[in-house]
Amino acid sequence: MRIRLATNNPYKLAEVSHILAPFCIEVERLDAEKVEIQHDDVVVIARKAAEFLCSRYGDFVVVDDTGLYIEALGGFPGPYAEYVYRTIGLKGVLKLLEGAADRRATFKCAAAICIGGRVEVFVGEVRGYIAHEPRGRGGFGYDPIFIPEGMTATYAELGEEVKNKISHRAKAFSQLGAWLTNRNLFK
């Protein structure tokens, strides 16, 4: 089986490929124009992007959108996590949290696939908290500052093998993989 993931992020492509490998699903990168949908819900963003890209590129197009919701910041950056990361980076986010006792955060990923004009969305969520400083060398994006609930290590410290089993993206894409496998869509 093969799906096409709309991303320009090589780390995300590798991560999704690793997550879907047990389902015997190959992931190739779809070189598509970036779809900018402004909404405060990653599910809506992923759904609309999948609809648009499916109309342009056909079936088995997959889009994911991720948000990081930090309690002390009223849910900021939410679905604007990528933009915030590019503009102020981890140091900027940590500066916003200076003096904050409540460092709880939730990572949410919505993975949407379009087949026959119909979009299915799968959501993965991980609760945790924001570290006081970046830790670890693995992963990408917010991985050095996000500590999943019940753990003491950041995603970056956990290593790829562990992260790809417990992350918000792993939860969303594992659901997508199971859904595709159960429907025998590739036979």
UniProtKB/Swiss-Prot annotation:
<keyword id="KW-0378">Hydrolase</keyword>
<keyword id="KW-0460">Magnesium</keyword>
<keyword id="KW-0547">Nucleotide-binding</keyword>
<feature type="binding site">
    <location>
        <position position="36"/>
    </location>
    <ligand>
        <name>Mg(2+)</name>
    </ligand>
</feature>
<dbReference type="GO" id="GO:0009117">
    <property type="term" value="P:nucleotide metabolic process"/>
</dbReference>
<dbReference type="GO" id="GO:0005737">
    <property type="term" value="C:cytoplasm"/>
</dbReference>
<dbReference type="InterPro" id="IPR002637">
    <property type="entry name" value="RdgB/HAM1"/>
</dbReference>
<feature type="active site" description="Proton acceptor">
    <location>
        <position position="65"/>
    </location>
</feature>
<dbReference type="GO" id="GO:0047429">
    <property type="term" value="F:nucleoside triphosphate diphosphatase activity"/>
</dbReference>
<dbReference type="GO" id="GO:0017111">
    <property type="term" value="F:ribonucleoside triphosphate phosphatase activity"/>
</dbReference>
<keyword id="KW-0546">Nucleotide metabolism</keyword>
<comment type="subunit">
    <text>Homodimer.</text>
</comment>
<feature type="binding site">
    <location>
        <begin position="7"/>
        <end position="12"/>
    </location>
    <ligand>
        <name>substrate</name>
    </ligand>
</feature>
<dbReference type="GO" id="GO:0009143">
    <property type="term" value="P:nucleoside triphosphate catabolic process"/>
</dbReference>
<dbReference type="Pfam" id="PF01725">
    <property type="entry name" value="Ham1p_like"/>
</dbReference>
<feature type="binding site">
    <location>
        <position position="66"/>
    </location>
    <ligand>
        <name>substrate</name>
    </ligand>
</feature>
<protein>
    <recommendedName>
        <fullName>dITP/XTP pyrophosphatase</fullName>
        <ecNumber>3.6.1.66</ecNumber>
    </recommendedName>
</protein>
<dbReference type="GO" id="GO:0009146">
    <property type="term" value="P:purine nucleoside triphosphate catabolic process"/>
</dbReference>
<feature type="binding site">
    <location>
        <position position="163"/>
    </location>
    <ligand>
        <name>substrate</name>
    </ligand>
</feature>
<dbReference type="GO" id="GO:0035870">
    <property type="term" value="F:dITP diphosphatase activity"/>
</dbReference>
<dbReference type="GO" id="GO:0000166">
    <property type="term" value="F:nucleotide binding"/>
</dbReference>
<feature type="binding site">
    <location>
        <begin position="140"/>
        <end position="143"/>
    </location>
    <ligand>
        <name>substrate</name>
    </ligand>
</feature>
<comment type="function">
    <text>Pyrophosphatase that catalyzes the hydrolysis of nucleoside triphosphates to their monophosphate derivatives, with a high preference for the non-canonical purine nucleotides XTP (xanthosine triphosphate), dITP (deoxyinosine triphosphate) and ITP. Seems to function as a house-cleaning enzyme that removes non-canonical purine nucleotides from the nucleotide pool, thus preventing their incorporation into DNA/RNA and avoiding chromosomal lesions.</text>
</comment>
<feature type="binding site">
    <location>
        <begin position="168"/>
        <end position="169"/>
    </location>
    <ligand>
        <name>substrate</name>
    </ligand>
</feature>
<dbReference type="InterPro" id="IPR020922">
    <property type="entry name" value="dITP/XTP_pyrophosphatase"/>
</dbReference>
<feature type="binding site">
    <location>
        <position position="65"/>
    </location>
    <ligand>
        <name>Mg(2+)</name>
    </ligand>
</feature>
<comment type="similarity">
    <text>Belongs to the HAM1 NTPase family.</text>
</comment>
<dbReference type="GO" id="GO:0036222">
    <property type="term" value="F:XTP diphosphatase activity"/>
</dbReference>
<keyword id="KW-0479">Metal-binding</keyword>
<dbReference type="GO" id="GO:0036220">
    <property type="term" value="F:ITP diphosphatase activity"/>
</dbReference>
<dbReference type="InterPro" id="IPR029001">
    <property type="entry name" value="ITPase-like_fam"/>
</dbReference>
<dbReference type="GO" id="GO:0046872">
    <property type="term" value="F:metal ion binding"/>
</dbReference>
